[in-house]
């Protein structure tokens, strides 16, 4: 725990009443304060990898895509993505290896999930040796317009 000393000019009611009201120089009161660092936790999508995600495609729920990538899209555009086939090229930064990869985010009109497909297997599963049970996290970086990816728990 980090401790810091702050000085305040505020007095308790008793101190205020007992001091001379004509004296403009109020004493400063030191207070030792504990500062708890707030851990930055950016992960908007956290998934435990399944067999299907290791051999086929990485599923991303529509709600997560809507809340991240499509946060600033119009309601009409979001409504359209629910019933249409969508495919877009995206960048995914692997924060553990500091590499950037291209991927295709795809959505079938009958499914309610988006998916990273072919590039997911080559660029992440094989290269990073991902296995069933690993926990991965992703978040959308608005400044760089890309997903950021990391293995949060590599235990099997």
Swiss-Prot record:
Keywords for the protein's UniProt record, in alphabetical order: DNA-binding, Nucleus, Transcription, Transcription regulation
Subcellular location: Nucleus
Single GO cellular component term: nucleus
Keyword Nucleus applies: yes
Organism: Arabidopsis thaliana
Source superkingdom: Eukaryota
Entries under InterPro entries matching the protein: B3_DNA-bd, B3_domain, DNA-bd_pseudobarrel_sf
Keyword Acetylation found: no
GO molecular function: DNA binding
Name by which UniProt lists this protein: B3 domain-containing protein At5g26805
Extent of the signal sequence: none
The entry's DNA-binding region: 57-155
């Amino acid at each position: 725990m980090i401790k810091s000393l702050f000085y305040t000019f505020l007095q308790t009611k008793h101190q205020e009443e007992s001091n001379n009201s004509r004296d403009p120089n109020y004493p400063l009161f030191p207070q030792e304060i504990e500062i708890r660092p707030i851990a930055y936790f950016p992960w908007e999508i956290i998934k435990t990898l399944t067999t299907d995600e290791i051999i086929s495609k990485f599923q991303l729920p529509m709600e997560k895509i809507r809340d991240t990538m499509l946060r600033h899209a119009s309601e009409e555009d979001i409504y359209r993505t629910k019933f249409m086939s969508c495919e877009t090229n995206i960048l995914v930064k692997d924060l553990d290896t500091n590499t950037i990869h291209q991927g295709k985010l795809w959505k079938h009109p009958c499914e309610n999930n988006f998916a990273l497909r072919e590039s997911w297997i080559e660029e992440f599963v094989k290269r990073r040796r991902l296995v069933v049970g690993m926990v991965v996290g992703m978040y959308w970086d608005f400044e760089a317009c890309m997903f950021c990816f990391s293995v949060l728990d590599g235990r099997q």
